[in-house]
Amino acid sequence: MDKHSKRSASIFRYPVLIAFTLFFAGLFLLDLVTPDRAYSELENTTLSQRPSLSSVSADGLNKFFTAYTKYVKDQVAGRDNWIALQSTVETKVMQKEQSGGILLGKQQMMFPRTYGLVSSETRTLPKNTAALEALCQRYPGKVNVMLVPAASAIYPESVPAGAPLLDEDCYLDSLSDAVQAAGGRFVDVRQTLTDHKDEYIYYRTDHHWTSTGAYYAYKLLCDTLGLTPFDPSAHTVLTADGFYGTHYSKARTPDAEPDTITYYDLPNELTIYSVSGPGQPADGETTGLYDTAKLDVYDKYAMFLHGNNGLSRIKGDGTGRILVIKDSYANCFAPYLTANYADIDVVDFRNYNYGLDKLIADNDYDQLLVLYSFDSFKSDPYLYRAGVAG
C-alpha cells in the first residue's frame, strides 16, 4: 500500500471527526448563502448585523470581535430551530424545570425567573415611587394607581417547587401606603385576581393578563369610582387562537399550549397623535381600537390599541375625561373605559418624552389612572417623567 493510500485509510478511521468536520463546513457554507435577518419575530427582538470593518480602527479589535461574535450567534442559519432543539433537550432529556430563563410550571403555565431586584431596579423603583407621590400631590384626589402582580404571585402553587421568586407583596404594600399618603388612591387588584384565579386571567405563554383578568380589575376601578361597568354581554366577543407569547419565545418548549386572545367588537375610534412637544397635539391618525392585521403575525397582543403609542385618544360613550398612564397591561384594559368616559387619553412614556402638566391643563381630566404591571413599574426608566412638574 502506498503512502497516499495509508493516509486516506488513517483518515477514515475517525468517522466521527469526519462527520463533525463536514457538518460544520456545511453550516459555514449555509451561513454564507443565508441572508441576514434584521428582526426575529419569534423572539420579538432585533438581531445583530455584521459589524463594519471600520470598527477595528474606531473601537479596537476587542470590540470588533465581540460584536462579530454576537453577529454570528444571532445570524446562524436555522437559529430558531437550534433554540427549539436546545429547549427540547433541556426539558425532555435533562428534565429541567426551566428553559431560557423561564420557569415551567403546572397547567402549562410559564413564569419569568425573578429572584430579586437587579441592580438597576434598586435605583429605578425608588425613582418611580417618588414620581407617583409627586403626581398624587400635584393632583390630589384625582390619581388612581393600579399595579398588577405577576402571575406567579397569584398562582404560587403552579411555580416549580423551591424556585425562589421576588416577594411582590411587600413592595406593593409599601407602594399602597406611599400613594395614599400622597393623596392618591391605590386600587389593589391582588385579592380580586385571587378570587378569580380559577378563570383564564393570565396567559400561559405570555407575561400579560388576559382580557378577562383586565375586566375584573376594571370592575374594581368602577367600584372605587362609583361607575357602572362595561357590560360584556351587550357586545360581540371575538377570539384569536394560536397566540404564543414572550415566555414561549424564550422557553421554546415543544409541548407548549397556545393561548387565545379575546376582545370585544367595539366601533369606537382611536386617534394616534404625532407628538413633538408637551401638551395636546393637533395632528393625529384616526383608526379603530384594534390592529387586526397583527392577529396574522407572531406578536398578536400588539393588536390592542395598535401597540404602545406615545399619546392616543379613544372616543368613548360616556362622559368626562380620563388620562391613562400605562405600560402594555393597559392595552386590553382601556377599551372597557369606553362605557364610562367620552375621552380616554393614553400615554406611554416609552414613546412620550415630556411631562404631563401641560397635557393635563389642556384637557382638564376628571381622573388619572396609572396602570402598570409591577414588573414594568420596578424597571421602567421613563416613568420618572410622571413626577416632573411643568
Q: Which residues fall in each region the model found?
A:
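Extracellular glycan-modifying ectodomains
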Residues: 1-390
